[in-house]
């Protein structure tokens, strides 16, 4: 039985969501008694991390969109069973850096795959598990890509090679999801200073936990 809460973190490339999540956890731990787990997709467990390497390998530029989607789904299932569900059943507060919405935005809006097919596959893989809250960090594609290019410490992966048009479609996909699920998805302006973005995210998380 699930007694914990699931919060997912989403955003287009360059939104800074991973950095925000890292800075969100310390102040959150000072305010809540629950044990907190942070993890990521694809990855989080050994099998899923191996799949992540396959997906992001810069040499795999011929990867078919459906192959890409199925690899993400496989990684998601293993991660869920091995790590996420046990934590939720133990009453933990679980943060996942990317989840189902990423598939809809990237493989759906970005790659042009049918949304209904993506949703069915995710329903199958997750047994219908849905986040209690999704923090969507929004940033225009031009700004996101500029941030990526300016970060010399970041290792380039296959997805960084995509055209700006695909990144723009991904963002539109995210914005459509936020409009479709206004109660679950909170849109946060990620162009603001980092400290402000973290503060807004913390407010929304606490609102969920104290409701």
UniProtKB/Swiss-Prot annotation:
Residues engaged in binding ATP: 11-18
Single GO term (MF): ATP binding
GO BP, sorted A to Z: dTDP biosynthetic process; dTTP biosynthetic process; dUDP biosynthetic process
Reaction equations catalysed: dTMP + ATP = dTDP + ADP
Gene Ontology CC annotations of this record: cytosol
Keywords assigned: ATP-binding, Kinase, Nucleotide biosynthesis, Nucleotide-binding, Transferase
EC number: 2.7.4.9
Entries under Pfam families matching the protein: Thymidylate_kin (PF02223)
Coiled-coil region: none
Top-rank taxon, per record: Bacteria
Keyword Transferase in annotation: yes
The family this protein is said to belong to: Belongs to the thymidylate kinase family.
Task performed by this protein: Phosphorylation of dTMP to form dTDP in both de novo and salvage pathways of dTTP synthesis.
Record's protein name: Thymidylate kinase
Source species: Streptococcus pyogenes serotype M5 (strain Manfredo)
Gene expressing this chain: tmk
């Amino acid at each position: 039985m699930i007694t914990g809460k699931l919060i997912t973190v989403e955003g287009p490339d360059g939104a800074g969501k991973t950095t925000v999540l890292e800075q969100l956890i310390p102040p959150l731990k000072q305010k809540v008694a629950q044990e907190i787990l942070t993890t990521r997709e694809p990855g989080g467990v050994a099998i899923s991390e191996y799949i992540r390497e396959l997906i992001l390998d810069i040499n795999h530029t011929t990867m078919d969109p459906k192959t890409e989607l199925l690899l993400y789904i496989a990684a998601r299932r293993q991660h869920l069973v091995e790590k996420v569900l046990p934590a939720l059943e133990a009453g933990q507060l679980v943060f996942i850096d990317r989840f189902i919405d990423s598939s809809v935005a990237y493989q759906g809006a970005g790659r042009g795959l049918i949304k209904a097919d993506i949703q069915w596959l995710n329903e199958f893989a997750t047994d219908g598990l849905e986040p209690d809250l999704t923090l969507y960090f929004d940033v225009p594609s031009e700004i996101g890509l500029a941030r990526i290019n300016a970060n010399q410490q970041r290792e380039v992966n296959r997805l960084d090679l995509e055209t700006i048009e695909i990144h723009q479609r991904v963002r539109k996909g995210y914005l459509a999801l936020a409009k479709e699920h206004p109660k679950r998805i909170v849109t946060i302006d990620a162009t603001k200073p980092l400290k402000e973005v973290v503060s807004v995210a913390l407010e929304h998380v606490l609102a969920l936990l104290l409701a």
